[in-house]
């Protein structure tokens, strides 16, 4: 593990340029509007969150899984691997990397099947179509894409330090923590260092709680312009989220999403060859 964030693969390889990110996304934006793509981000983050909660994983494991998911689709089109397969794959890998312990094959498939059926049936009327061999193959592609750069830094630790330094832990921490969780529904984890995201979330929490922290922020040696950029993204998320009726909209958005070849049918799932490449696309 890197001794600190500035020497880590997270900083050196996975803080991306916004223009490069948008350029990579153009293939998908031929099929989806920017707003629809944003809603897909929110939706699949919700799927990963629900999977993690079902498996009783720590929030940091869920956050790491979400970052893996975003990293993959920052480099590849949604068409390359079905996000419905990628989501549990990211949870599976993150649980190992964050030393939570390996989630057993049976539990993982059971959780994915149950969560899609009970929480997201309005978007996925059919059964979860994948089995463990698909997840293991998908994990291989995910590891290859990330070049085995698996350590992810999160805003939670710096947030805790900042709130303690400010001396307002009880008032600010619960709200700022929830805002950090919400930032994973955006691109922020791909674009900014975690400590900046933590400061932006703390700033929003201070405004909401009417805590005057101008002096505390003024004494920081940090680029406040970047903090304000992050705050604008957070506020845009809440504005868009407020008007997002997931149950009504997601089926249509998912139908427009570029897809790999159709997932295996029930007869082909157990066969050694019938479903080998059905969740992947080379184009």
From Swiss-Prot:
Entries under SMART domains matching the protein: CYCLIN (SM00385)
GO molecular function, one term: cyclin-dependent protein serine/threonine kinase regulator activity
Family matches, as CDD domains: CYCLIN_CCNC_rpt1, CYCLIN_CCNC_rpt2
Any coiled-coil regions, as ranges: none
Cellular location(s): Nucleus
Gene Ontology CC annotations of this record: mediator complex; nucleus
Keyword hit for Translocase: no
Pfam family, one: Cyclin_C_2
Region listing for Disordered, in residue ranges: 252-283
Regions of compositional bias (Polar residues) in chain numbering: 272-283
Gene Ontology biological process terms, A to Z: positive regulation of transcription by RNA polymerase II
Residue intervals of the Cyclin N-terminal domain: 46-144
Subunit structure: Component of the Mediator complex. The cylin/CDK pair formed by CCNC/CDK8 also associates with the large subunit of RNA polymerase II.
Role noted for this protein: Component of the Mediator complex, a coactivator involved in regulated gene transcription of nearly all RNA polymerase II-dependent genes. Mediator functions as a bridge to convey information from gene-specific regulatory proteins to the basal RNA polymerase II transcription machinery. Mediator is recruited to promoters by direct interactions with regulatory proteins and serves as a scaffold for the assembly of a functional preinitiation complex with RNA polymerase II and the general transcription factors.
Family stated for the protein in its record: Belongs to the cyclin family. Cyclin C subfamily.
PANTHER family found in the cross-reference section: CYCLIN (PTHR10026)
Protein name per the record: Cyclin-C
């Amino acid at each position: 593990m890197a001794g600190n964030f500035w020497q880590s693969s997270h900083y050196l390889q996975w803080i991306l340029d916004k223009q490069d990110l948008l350029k990579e996304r153009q293939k998908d934006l031929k099929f989806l509007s920017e707003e629809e793509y944003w809603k897909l981000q929110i939706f699949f983050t919700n799927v990963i969150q629900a999977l993690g909660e079902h498996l009783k994983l720590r929030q940091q494991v869920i956050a790491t899984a979400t970052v893996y998911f975003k990293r993959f689709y920052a480099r590849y089109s949604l068409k390359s691997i079905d996000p419905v397969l990628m989501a549990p794959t990211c949870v599976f890998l993150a649980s190992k990397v964050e030393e939570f312990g390996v989630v057993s094959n049976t539990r993982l498939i059971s959780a994915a099947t149950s969560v899609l059926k009970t929480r997201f049936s309005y978007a996925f009327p059919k059964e979860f179509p994948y089995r463990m061999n698909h997840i293991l193959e998908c994990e291989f592609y995910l590891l290859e894409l990330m070049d085995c750069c698996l350590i992810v830094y999160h805003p939670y630790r710096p947030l805790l330090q900042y709130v303690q330094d400010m001396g307002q832990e009880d008032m600010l921490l619960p709200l700022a923590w929830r805002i950090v969780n919400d930032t994973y529904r955006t691109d922020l984890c791909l674009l900014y260092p975690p400590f900046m995201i933590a400061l932006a979330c703390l700033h929003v929490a201070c405004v909401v709680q009417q805590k005057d922290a101008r002096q505390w922020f003024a004494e920081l040696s940090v680029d406040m312009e970047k903090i304000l950029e992050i705050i604008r993204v957070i506020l845009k998320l809440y504005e868009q989220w407020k008007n997002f009726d997931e149950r009504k909209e997601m089926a249509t958005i998912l139908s427009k999403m570029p897809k790999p070849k159709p997932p295996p049918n029930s007869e082909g799932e157990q066969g050694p060859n019938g479903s080998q490449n059905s969740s992947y696309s080379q184009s």
